[in-house]
Amino acid sequence: LIYLLLSIACSVLLGFIFKLFARFGVHTFQAIMFNYFTCLACGWLHSGNLPFSEADRGEPWMPYALLLGLVFISGFNTAALTVRYFGVTVSQVMQKMSILLTVPFAILVYGESSGAAKLLGFALALCSIVLVNWPASKQQTTTNNGLGRLWIPLLTWVLAGVIEMVFVLVQHNRMTDQGDPAFITTIFSTAGILGLAVCGFGWASGRFAFSWRNVAAGVVLGIPNYGSMLFLLMALGSGMEASLAFPLTNVGIILATTIGAVWLFEERLSAVNWWGIALAVAAIVFISV
């Protein structure tokens, strides 16, 4: 459980760092790209090895790591588009709703436990995710976007689910039960290389402006980003079922982020939001039974 709590803490810290980017004039995509190479450095310091070595190329997890690197970059881009066209609330809800894919996948494909308490907790978790993210006032989201752009939030949801399902697959095939840093750094390296290609085109075309501020932001972002994935894999490797780990992680992140936002950033919550927090606590209790 301690590994799961550490993963949640790192993920919450990521959200707070993102919230500060606009205040300090950070270019989000460039910071994300530099964050991936920071994660690579963390993996090198942790394991002493760099990705794509001759030994790593023969590992059974290599194709999955390459796939995840691509999905990471794609998921970030679609999440950013969702924020642009539908708002932050829709983007966050669609990403957290990935448990609608992950939990049934773990239960149906791998036969993980699905008792009444877990199913009730699963339902409460879904309700809490929606209520905690419920806007305090009406916000313009899909009004002027039409049906032509509905694929953007739907793709955000699907990609978030794909990431978690691949982790479930890797866990059940005992490829990285102990959070192999080579597996993690390969994922981030693949995403970083793809991101560097995009940034390189942006710099060459003049669409992006290089700034050391973005490099520094990427370093600050990369350390907890690496930790969030490492500790999640270690939690799964310790024997915790994926159908338990992912809902707890998603609900825990929303719960901790909401409370932190109220204390640190003085964000106001509606009565509906507080009901969502209460349901999140109840969901954690039922899922943990």
Spans of features found by a protein language model:
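Membrane-interface interhelical linkers
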Residues: 1-66, 76-85, 136-154, 186-238, ...
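C-terminal appended segment following the main domain
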Residues: 2, 227-289
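Hydrophobic/small/kink-forming positions within alpha-helical transmembrane segments
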Residues: 8, 12, 44, 69, ...
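Residues that define the loop-to-transmembrane-helix transition and helix capping
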Residues: 29, 89, 115, 178-182, ...
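Membrane-embedded alpha-helical segments of multi-pass transporters/permeases
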Residues: 40, 44-48, 107-108, 130, ...
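Hydrophobic alpha-helical transmembrane segments in multi-pass integral membrane proteins
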Residues: 42-53, 103-118, 159-172, 224-240, ...
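Specific alpha-helical transmembrane segments that line the substrate/conduction pathway
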Residues: 71, 83-110, 118-123, 184-193, ...
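Loop-to-transmembrane alpha-helix entry segments
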Residues: 95, 111-131, 150, 263-286
